[in-house]
């Protein structure tokens, strides 16, 4: 399910309410559809996880929003100077007595102002919701009315029936792990999948004599490459210098290694991305962390950026090497 498949259904649904849709809210940088996602549903069905995923996808997110503030918040985000905003995802405070009526009024107001929105409803079966509450040890919001958890969930489900019936998407998360839900939402709502990959890459160059980075997911030992330390004119330089980079990368082993490294990561990173991983830390080490690891890390930064990954780099021991 993708946004392009959802939009026509939204147009049909919202036009049936006697409101023609002339133009959606647009992001500041790309004149394309600007997703506004309203999240409601059963407590424990995954709303907080969904909001975290949307935040990772560069949407502005907020939880516990009263329905009366939704429209004004949409206009605030649309008119702000926030960079790289890809949309807005709002979790609604649905446990006040008059929330359902307020939500209906809010939806009518949004339609009258020609605002596209997707109403995402999350649910799960009763045993699963009870199990999740047992794991988190948090009280259900309706338990404040001196009723038990199961009764609170039943009452919540009853209150939400009108909203569920009008939802654009009803997602049953009973069999979903957190990672399953993340994968589904990333695949369905990444607005620019060919331009922005979900997974973030963190590259660290380091020196083995100072210790291996604890946060490394992938670690490469580069001490097999020719060492510029033993070349007098290169010793005071770092892998950031062109002479050192040329010495390392254009060596016989360097040429072969960089080819195999890029090919390996081109195979592996999409698999991590498809699994719903948020970040991968790649650590590349040499003896002192000044020459070889820095040169290869800078090459990797360049190559992965070309493949549209979001990449950060840290030369942890370059000044010590």
UniProtKB/Swiss-Prot annotation:
Keywords tagged on the record: ATP-binding, GTP-binding, Nucleotide-binding
GO molecular function: ATP binding; GTP binding
Binding sites annotated in the UniProt record for ATP: 41-48
Pfam families in UniProt: PapZ_C (PF22740), RapZ-like_N (PF03668)
rRNA-binding found in the keyword field: no
NCBIfam families: PRK05416.1
Similarity comment: Belongs to the RapZ-like family.
UniProt function note: Displays ATPase and GTPase activities.
Name the record gives this protein: Nucleotide-binding protein LI0459
Protein's organism: Lawsonia intracellularis (strain PHE/MN1-00)
């Amino acid at each position: 399910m993708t946004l392009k498949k959802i939009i026509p259904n939204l147009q049909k649904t919202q036009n049936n309410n006697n409101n023609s849709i002339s133009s959606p809210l647009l992001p500041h940088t790309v004149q394309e559809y600007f997703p506004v996602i309203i999240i409601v549903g059963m407590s424990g069905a995954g709303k907080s996880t969904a909001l975290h995923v949307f935040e990772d996808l560069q949407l502005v997110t907020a939880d516990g929003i009263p329905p009366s503030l939704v429209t004004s918040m949409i206009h605030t985000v649309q008119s702000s100077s926030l960079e790289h905003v890809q949309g807005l995802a709002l979790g609604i405070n649905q446990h006040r007595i008059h929330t359902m009526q307020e939500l209906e009024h809010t939806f009518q107001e949004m339609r009258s102002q020609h605002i596209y929105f997707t109403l995402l409803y999350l649910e799960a079966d009763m045993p699963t919701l009870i199990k999740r509450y047992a794991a988190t040890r948090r009280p259900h919001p309706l338990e404040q009315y001196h009723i038990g958890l199961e009764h609170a969930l039943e009452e919540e489900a009853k209150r939400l029936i009108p909203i569920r019936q009008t939802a654009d998407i009803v997602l049953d998360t009973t069999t979903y792990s957190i990672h399953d839900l993340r994968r589904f939402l990333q695949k369905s709502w990444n607005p620019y999948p060919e331009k922005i990959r979900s997974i973030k890459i963190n590259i660290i160059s380091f020196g083995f004599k100072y210790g291996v980075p604890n946060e490394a997911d992938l670690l490469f030992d580069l001490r097999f490459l020719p060492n510029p330390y033993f070349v007098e004119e290169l010793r005071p330089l770092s892998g950031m210098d062109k002479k050192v980079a040329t010495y390392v990368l254009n060596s016989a082993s360097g040429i072969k290694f960089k080819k195999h490294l890029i090919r390996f990561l081109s195979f592996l990173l999409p698999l991590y991305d498809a699994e719903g991983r948020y970040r991968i830390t790649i650590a590349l080490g040499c003896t002192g962390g000044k020459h070889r690891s820095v040169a290869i890390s800078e090459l990797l930064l360049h190559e992965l950026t070309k493949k549209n990954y979001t990449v950060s780099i840290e030369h942890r021991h370059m000044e010590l090497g």
